[in-house]
Structure formats: structure tokens, C-alpha cells
Amino acid sequence: MAFIGVDHGTTAMRFALIEGEKVLTFELGRSEAAAMSEKEILESIEKEFEVKVKDIDLIALTYSMGDGFSEIKDVKKIEGRGLQSTEGAGKKTGGGTRVFDAVKNSGIPAIAIPGLHTRSKVDPRMKVFSHLTSPEKLGIAYHIRCMGYKDFVVSDISSNTVTLAVASGKVIGAIDACIFAPGVHHGPLDLEAIRNVDDGLRTANQAFMEAGALKMTPYKDRGELLNAAENGEEPALLALDTISLFAAMEIVSMQLLLKEYGVTGAAFLAGSVGEVEYVQKKISRHLGQECLSLGKWHAAIGCAGIARDVFAGENHILGIDVDYP
């Protein structure tokens, strides 16, 4: 039986196939996916996974914020691709839209995974914020759950930073990219950013997308930053030190929430910056505990695991209700 998970990432669309014990992965850049037809998207899936569309049992999709619904459900029951609005925090390329529509229109059985927001079953105090995390982070969390962990915090650090807490196998809260810890490109709006928005110099979304640690440096993107850090350049190391400090703060805050639920748990790091050894060591030192690192594929693999287990009849995933079939 073949199950596929799709991670709508910041820079790429990542796909994972679970077929028995076999796990395969591939990715399409978001701009690359946007330039493809729906037919070409499906052909890529067939080619990379050596599987026919008709033989796919279930696909689990993530799309953008996922704030228009709160249950895992059939994509046919989703309106507006599961969004309250197409506006929001992040860059629009059209790649995620192309993949979502290709799967929805293909006839392949598919479910959509929601993000966490005010209508989700999380700690009610977290609902002071309208949005907590986008759907692919639940894929990461479910992959960790399938590894045997019931209590944990995971921080996904890349273009932005999002941290999520799971207690007794249920997600209880998360801190979204625009709330606290900065990533490389994105971060919360500070005083200067708010003034720039009020003065019409930036939209709020532009300010968010320019609020990451990269603004402290002369580098133009994440690749340049990480290469410079490998060469020991001071501005790059300061940026990574900054990201590490605030990510550690975010992890500690979620660990505090775990304690209120009577548990303690492991700390995981994910994302292209979270898997950098320098960052791992810094955060582990801040926390006083070893952090376990995940690669960039775990969101897609976790989503494929959700597809597999929903197909097998699971009614709840990480405490989230399932409305399928």
C-alpha cells in the first residue's frame, strides 16, 4: 500500500512515500512547481516514486496556514484550500497551490491537515494568538510521535522559527513564526518595523519577511549566511548565535507548558538551520540538555505517516479529530 505526505515548505514542496518499510523522498522548488502543469506534477510523483497514480491509497496534504479548518478531512470537503484568507505572513509563489490543486483534481484519495489556530484543541491560553503553526509542523510532530515519543518539544528553525509542544501524544500549543524567535529571513515586528508599516514604508508582510537575523549581516540569503558561518565569519556567527538564543528561549517556554501538564520531554530541532551542528551545540548548551536533530524530510514523512494511519482507521492524530472518509 502506498501513502504520500506533502510538506508545503518555505522554499520547496517536499514529498515522501511510505510503502511498507520503504520510504522515498523528493522535492520541487516552489517556483519550479508553480511553473509546472497539474499533469506534470502528477507525472513527477509517478516518476520519482515509481508508483502509478491509481495505486496511491491516500495522500496527506499541507497548504499554507491551514487556518480555515480544524480537523483532518477529505480535500473534497475543504473550501478555499483550507484558508481563511490568501493574505498573510509569507511569500507567495504559486507552487503550493499548483500541488494542492493537482492532487485535489486528480481523483487520488487525499486528506488535508489543518494548522493550529483559535479553533484548535490546544491549551486555551495559547489562543491569545490567532495562529500558532502551519500544518507541516504537525507532520514533524507526528513523525516524532511515530518514533516512540509521547512528550516533547520540537523547534523548526529555517527561514523562520516555529516551536511546538506535545504532551501525552497530544499537541497542546505552539509559537508561530511571527510571534517570537526569529529565523534567518522572518521574525516578529519590532518597534522600528511597526513604525515603518504605519508610515507606509513596508506592508506588515514585508516587515515580517525582513525581520530575521539576516538583517544583522551583509549576506543576501541563507546559503551565504551558512557558508560564511562555516568560514568563521563574525557577522554570520552572531546571526546564528542570535537564532540559537531565541530558539532556546522558545523551547524553554514550551517546556514550561509541558510541566503544567505533568510531563517533561525530549527537545528536537528540525529545519535547515536546526540541523547545523553549531546551532545544535549552542541550543543544547543553553538548555542544559541534548537536542535531537531531524533532517528536512521529516515533515513530509510524518504527513505520509498520517495518511497511512488515517487510512487504517485512526480517529485522532496528535489529539486532532479526523473526519475521513
UniProtKB/Swiss-Prot annotation:
InterPro entries: ATPase_NBD, Methan_mark_12
Family label: Belongs to the UPF0285 family.
Record-given protein name: UPF0285 protein MM_0679
